[in-house]
Curated annotation (Swiss-Prot):
Native source organism of the sequence: Chondrus crispus
Protein family: Belongs to the succinate dehydrogenase/fumarate reductase iron-sulfur protein family.
Keywords: 2Fe-2S, 3Fe-4S, 4Fe-4S, Electron transport, Iron, Iron-sulfur, Membrane, Metal-binding, Mitochondrion, Mitochondrion inner membrane, Oxidoreductase, Transport, Tricarboxylic acid cycle
GO biological process: respiratory electron transport chain; tricarboxylic acid cycle
GO annotations of cellular component type: mitochondrial inner membrane
Localization per record: Mitochondrion inner membrane
Predominant cellular place of this UniProt entry's protein: mitochondrion
Function: Iron-sulfur protein (IP) subunit of succinate dehydrogenase (SDH) that is involved in complex II of the mitochondrial electron transport chain and is responsible for transferring electrons from succinate to ubiquinone (coenzyme Q).
Protein's name in the database: Succinate dehydrogenase [ubiquinone] iron-sulfur subunit
Comment on bound cofactor: Binds 1 [2Fe-2S] cluster.
Residues where a ubiquinone binds: W178
Gene (UniProt): SDH2
Length: 250
C-alpha cells in the first residue's frame, strides 16, 4: 500500500513486517492556512526505543523536525506527554510500541484547544487548579517543630498525592467536555480531595463550601471514564464521590 503525505512524500507500507510500525499523527499548524491533517511515519522497532514517546522523538529527530509535542521526564512522573493514543488518553512514555496493529493513531487530548500538533492548551486546567488552593492552610500558624501525621492519617493520602496533573482523566470526561468553563473536572477534584483529607490542613470546611456547587462538583455524573483512563491507576471517581458524601453529611 502506498500513502502520500501532505508534503507529497510517498510512503510504501509493508504490513508483512512484524517490526514495522506506522505512526499516524494528527497535525495542525496555526501559521499555515490549512485544515488539520494526518502525517504517517514509518518506524522500525528494531532501531527505536520501546515506547510511543521514543517513536515520536525519533520521528522529530530524523523524519520531521516540525512535529510538535510536549515531553520531559520520560518516566511517567511529569505528565507532559499526555495525548490520545489509539482512542485512549495516556502518557506516551508509558505506552508500548508493541501493539497488535501495525498502525498507531495519535491525537492531542480531546476537547481541548490546540496550540500546535499534539500540544493542548491547558491554561484553563491550571487556572482551575489554582482555584482549589493546592497547599496546606494552617489558620493557627506554623510552629518551629514538625507538623507530624500519624501513619493512619498519612495512609489517607495514598491514591491522591500521586496525581501528576496530566489531564488525561479530565479530557476523557463528557461532563468536562461540555462544561469546562464551570465544572472543575476529575483531576482538579481529586487534587481538592487530597487537601480535604490531609490531617495537617485546617481549612476543610472552607474547601467543602467552595466545592458545594452544582457546577463545580455536582456536574459529575459518575461516568467513570476518568478512573478507566488514568495512567497512574488512580480513582478520581471515588475521590469525587467522597467529596459529595462529606458535603451531604456535613
Amino acid at each position: 500500500m502506498i500513502i502520500k503525505n501532505l508534503n507529497q512524500k510517498i510512503i510504501t507500507i509493508d504490513n508483512s513486517s512484524p517490526y514495522q510500525k506506522f505512526i499516524r499523527i494528527y497535525r495542525w499548524n496555526p501559521n499555515l492556512n490549512l485544515n488539520p491533517w494526518f502525517s504517517i511515519f514509518p518506524i522500525s522497532t528494531n532501531n527505536c526505543g520501546p515506547m510511543i514517546l521514543d517513536a515520536l522523538i525519533q520521528i522529530k529527530n530524523i523524519q520531521d523536525s516540525s512535529l510538535t509535542f510536549r515531553r520531559s521526564c520520560r518516566e511517567g512522573i511529569c505528565g507532559s506527554c499526555s495525548m490520545n493514543i489509539d482512542g485512549t488518553n495516556s502518557l506516551a512514555c508509558l505506552r508500548s510500541l508493541n501493539t497488535k496493529s501495525n498502525f498507531i493513531t495519535i491525537y492531542p487530548l480531546p476537547h481541548t484547544y490546540i496550540i500546535k500538533d499534539l500540544v493542548p492548551d491547558l491554561s484553563n486546567f491550571y487556572a482551575q487548579y489554582k482555584l482549589i488552593k493546592p497547599w496546606l492552610i494552617n489558620k493557627i500558624g506554623f510552629s518551629l517543630k514538625e507538623n507530624l501525621q500519624s501513619k493512619i492519617d498519612r495512609l489517607e493520602l495514598d491514591g491522591l498525592y500521586e496525581c501528576i496533573l496530566c489531564a488525561c482523566c479530565s479530557a476523557s470526561c463528557p461532563s468536562y467536555w461540555w462544561n469546562q468553563d464551570k465544572y472543575l473536572g476529575p483531576a482538579i477534584l481529586l487534587q481538592a480531595y487530597r487537601w480535604i483529607v490531609d490531617s495537617r490542613d485546617n481549612s476543610t470546611e472552607n474547601r467543602l463550601n467552595f466545592l458545594n456547587n452544582k457546577m463545580r462538583l455536582f456536574r459529575c455524573h459518575t461516568i467513570m471514564n476518568c478512573s478507566k483512563t488514568c495512567p497512574k491507576s488512580l480513582n478520581p471517581g471515588k475521590a469525587i464521590a467522597s467529596i459529595k458524601y462529606r458535603i451531604i453529611n456535613n
